[in-house]
Amino acid sequence: MKLLKSLAVSAMALLFAATAQAKEVTLLMDWFPQGNQSVFWQAMLDNDEHDLKINVKAGGPGINTAAQTAAGSVEFGLQGSDSVMAANAKGAGLVAVFANLDHVPYTLVFHPDQGIKTIQDLDGRRFAVKMGVTYWKWVKAEYGVSADEFPLKGDLALFAREKEMFQQGYSLFLPARLAAQGVATDQITLESLGYRPYSVLFTTQKMIDENPELVQEVVDRLRAAFAKSLNNPDPTADLILSKSKKVTRDIHMGAIELMKADFLPKDYSKLGCMKSERWEELSAQLKQVDMVPGDFDASSSYNLSFLGNCE
């Protein structure tokens, strides 16, 4: 009888230990599945090799990634560093721990036969834009331009018809999608104008305070997955393209090459790295357009300690 009790206690202890080790986190993306998210989908594909299970959840219209992460509905979210600071100005308590792109690939796309050479040449034109987007507030203030803004609905046919309008998008995808439909484009990137927020994975300060080991494990997993997905992009391409039909395989693979050329470090050991100076630069730009208060402390919105090896 004592032996049976002992075995039962041992079994319960083993079950408890197994349950305690069954760690799981959810990463909420900034948009539908697409190539700039490859690192996160690769991490999910690698789950069988690790105790920590990383689930990736697609974003999209009407999904507020920052708000859901701040509320604890998910453990991590993906957005621009400008969105993180704007949310923190309202008390969200978010902290970026990993950059998946050196800058969000915001771009302004227009028809090439309109005589547009500079940002000022877009003044007064119709503009398909995500209403209230932070970068456009800064562009208007910095360059003194305005536009006839209307909500972006992703209607490429409208852009093809209206020769004088311009449209926001990601430089990794929008020009290539239009080219595939026979529509020639030119573009002005926000990075070329001096606005360059990181694309970042963030969590909450509460998570960092209560479970820093878990945050570190996620960051380490992402670094390994990132290099893996860049060296062999086919598995993540298969997964992403099965979930979203907005781009072809050629466009997806082209975006990966653009990322490697212009958005990622050549040394893959530096993947995920960020610099304090860039956060301070962006904070000053956000203060310029009253997106954060004048006394806002940018350092409260990021934590470099999980990255290491970034010098």
Regions found by a protein language model. Give the residues of each.
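N-terminal signal peptide c-region/cleavage motif recognized by signal peptidases
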Residues: 15-20
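Pocket-lining segment of extracytoplasmic ligand-binding domains
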Residues: 82, 148, 152-246
